[in-house]
Amino acid sequence: MKIAVDGMGGDFAPKEVVAGCVDALNENKDLHIVITGKEELIKKELEGHNYDEDRIEVLDAREVISTNDSPVMAIRRKKDSSLNKGLQLVKEKKVEGIISAGSTGAFMAGSLFIVGRIKGIDRPALAPIMPGKNAPFMVIDVGANAECKPQNLLQFALMGKIYFEKILNVKNPTIGLVNIGVEEEKGTELTKEAYKLLKNSGLNFIGNVEPRDIPTGDVNILVCDGFTGNTILKTYEGVAQNIFEILKAEIMSSFQGKIGGALLKPSFKNIKKKFNYKEYGGAAFIGVEGICVKAHGSSDRKAFKNAIKQCINFHKGNIINNIKEELVNIETLH
């Protein structure tokens, strides 16, 4: 498998990007990587690593898209950017997929304009796997589509189901619709109409799910518009971070707390690992004609390595072709 990695995207590029690529390369003997970005900077970072030189290429790109750039304008104007060049490789089928920790807006815009949508999918969606109390779960969409139609939510559910089955090996995953109550008649016109479509779709739809029940992980896939999903994602991240900080402050506030903290240190480490985004790689942008994974902006080498692993699993699961086949089978999507 061959993938492109945006060497200039993210808070710690290119150092952590390159390190993550090397780690992934050394763990996967059939993997080839093209790192796009400023050639001299990337090659300088590569000098400190041991790797198979035949399996890493550097594609020079002189421009960088920043988070301050207008996403659409940057994709149109910065043709020589590391992100643009990587996306072009996907479009030309020279690589199977791309990973970037750069601007989310530019990544999604570029994936749409350059790589293109799967025929029959109206709107691709951003879908991270998130840690839950009992099991990991997916939220789809978390920001690609602030406003949606009921049919969009049905397509999100379909794409999420295929992705979840292949990546987490869960057969016929449960699907819930994020809403303010569990009753069928609750919610906006969007959720009411989406409920009807999901109920009759043949998917394993279990009904509405209230936000307070999301963190359990008892429902595999949570479907919502991108505005709602982004709010869930950022609230989840913020609450988790604050809980760890509060726990740390309480433990350090007394002698007894320090003793208790020392005894519970292994448990705290396990919990922290479970809620660490680095363990999950990135969010897949599902519904485009290529594997597009958006890594967290502050990704380190471990996060990049896991994002690459995610790409590999996406490829092995043949997810794009599976989505195309499922579109033919479900008449309500047409």
Swiss-Prot record:
It comes from the Bacteria. SUPFAM superfamilies: Isocitrate/Isopropylmalate dehydrogenase-like. It catalyses: a fatty acyl-[ACP] + phosphate = an acyl phosphate + holo-[ACP]. One of its GO terms (biological process) is fatty acid biosynthetic process. Pathway: Lipid metabolism; phospholipid metabolism. Its EC number is 2.3.1.274. Its main location: cytoplasm. Keywords: Cytoplasm, Lipid biosynthesis, Lipid metabolism, Phospholipid biosynthesis, Phospholipid metabolism, Transferase. GO terms for molecular function: phosphate:acyl-[acyl carrier protein] acyltransferase activity. One of its GO terms (cellular component) is cytoplasm. It is found in: Cytoplasm. Catalyzes the reversible formation of acyl-phosphate (acyl-PO(4)) from acyl-[acyl-carrier-protein] (acyl-ACP). This enzyme utilizes acyl-ACP as fatty acyl donor, but not acyl-CoA. NCBIfam families: plsX. PANTHER family: FATTY ACID/PHOSPHOLIPID SYNTHESIS PROTEIN PLSX, PHOSPHATE ACYLTRANSFERASE. Homodimer. Probably interacts with PlsY. Belongs to the PlsX family. This is Phosphate acyltransferase. It comes from Clostridium tetani (strain Massachusetts / E88).
